[in-house]
């Protein structure tokens, strides 16, 4: 049995136990894609087909994968939903830090991704792929992405939404304020006006020196002052300039602590791109097809993070990393463990369910 076939059959067995799709062949092809992405570390369909354990020619396998990403009966949101719900349920004992961010994928397309933060990793929950270039998108699209999250969240979970200045639109903030148990910490532009009493001024008019944090409670946001929120100015000693945040949290220092975590979604995109699966080089240009490819790539990513957690839990880190500390990320630990297990013919089971642990050491 080849390494490729071993990975594929193990993934297929687990997926058959977890998924029921409209056609049995869809699960089989999804298993091919996940296995090929992991073993080849590349999400380009031609590369995935070359890694697939099948007697068919690589070109024939590639055409099968292309038919799969074109298939209208495969709804990425529906297939991924049970995995996303399990992630949030596993983490719901603590406030859930959700982060929204966009990145370029495929050819001429962008993905707007909503993820939950855990152990310096952003775990994908849902996404929207659309035609466009890097830059701001519409508030309606932001709300559409967040609406996809609502049926995934546990009933009593506390949620804190994080995002950069692209997401500080009045329309989206009003939507978030209508949701029960949702808070937000979003970066905003220093040029935006706020109203405090009868005074209106740009945010950067408030005095702020390096090493300082200031907070203004219940200021009117923008010159229209359609909603009131808390404003935080934060100039950390590690930053060249100040950051300005709008938040529903009363504690400015807590808002800064939350916002510092926002940058962890960059690790997800780098794992999906240059450090991992190179999904930005997939050459696909249709948003719906890219969304289905992202389904396979996100499941592969989730497996690697869960595998990394298991490596730590079973105290096997020293076999693939330093013995005195953990240098590798959860994602990289997972990837390297699969390679190590295949090299030594060790048994493993693909894991797509997050196991939360309070005792986990601080890892990337």
What are these regions (language model features)?
Residues 1-42, 79-81, 91-96, 107, ...:
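Single, function-defining residue in the core of a domain
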Residues 31, 45-46, 62:
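Short amphipathic alpha-helical segments
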Residues 32-36, 49-51, 84-87, 99-102:
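Short secondary-structure capping/turn segments at boundaries of alpha-helices and beta-strands
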Residues 45-56:
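DNA-recognition alpha helix
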Residues 58-71:
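Major-groove recognition helix of helix-turn-helix-like DNA-binding domains
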Residues 68-83, 87:
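Short, basic alpha-helical nucleic acid-contact segments in DNA-binding proteins
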Residues 99-111:
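An active-site-proximal beta-strand-loop segment
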Residues 114:
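Histidine-anchored nucleotide/phosphate-binding helix
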